[in-house]
């Protein structure tokens, strides 16, 4: 199963994103395939915060458009909801220790812990996931 990170969702959704032309076709293939994938609610919250933010995008996505994207992706039959499970804090601590994570790396460790617990590969444009030895990481084409 794939766990999709916010930067992949932003690149797929926003036509003005520098990686849109390469990430969107990859993302469309993911949606058309039968491979299970997940987008944790934490990632969706980040997506909504960033894509509708005037400080991030000169022309932010209208909130209705952003939610329509969220709902369309979540409606895919092979999208499986995930959330932190009973081992989350133990896994989070392990990942933080192995990568000496603090500050801005903590959210990546949180996603990594969800991925490990649910046997997912993290799909992200963020190279920081390589710092977590026990997290499988896939970088879509850019």
From Swiss-Prot:
EC id: 3.1.-.-
Superkingdom, taxonomy of origin: Bacteria
Boundaries of every PINc domain copy: 3-139
This protein's UniProt keywords: Hydrolase, Magnesium, Metal-binding, Nuclease, Toxin-antitoxin system
Cited Pfam families: PIN (PF01850)
EC class (word): hydrolase
Gene Ontology molecular function terms on file: magnesium ion binding; RNA nuclease activity
Binding site for Mg(2+): 5, 108
Cofactor: Mg(2+)
UniProt GO BP: negative regulation of growth
Coiled coil: none
Stated family: Belongs to the PINc/VapC protein family.
Entry function: Toxic component of a type II toxin-antitoxin (TA) system. An RNase. Its toxic effect is neutralized by coexpression with cognate antitoxin VapB25.
Protein's name according to its UniProt entry: Ribonuclease VapC25
Organism (species): Mycobacterium tuberculosis (strain CDC 1551 / Oshkosh)
Gene from which the chain derives: vapC25
């Amino acid at each position: 199963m794939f766990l999709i990170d916010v930067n992949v969702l932003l690149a797929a959704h926003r036509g003005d994103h520098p990686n849109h032309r390469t990430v969107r076709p990859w993302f469309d293939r993911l949606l058309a395939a039968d491979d299970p994938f997940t987008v944790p609610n934490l990632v969706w919250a980040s997506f909504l915060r960033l894509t509708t933010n005037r400080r991030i995008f000169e022309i932010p996505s209208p909130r209705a458009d952003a939610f329509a994207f969220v709902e369309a992706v979540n409606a895919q039959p092979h999208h499986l909801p995930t959330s932190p499970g009973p081992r989350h804090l133990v896994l989070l601590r392990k990942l933080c220790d192995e990568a000496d994570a603090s500050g801005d790396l903590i959210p990546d460790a949180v996603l990594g812990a969800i991925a490990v617990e649910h046997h997912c590969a993290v799909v992200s444009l963020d190279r920081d996931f390589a710092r977590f030895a026990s997290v499988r990481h896939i970088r879509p084409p850019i």
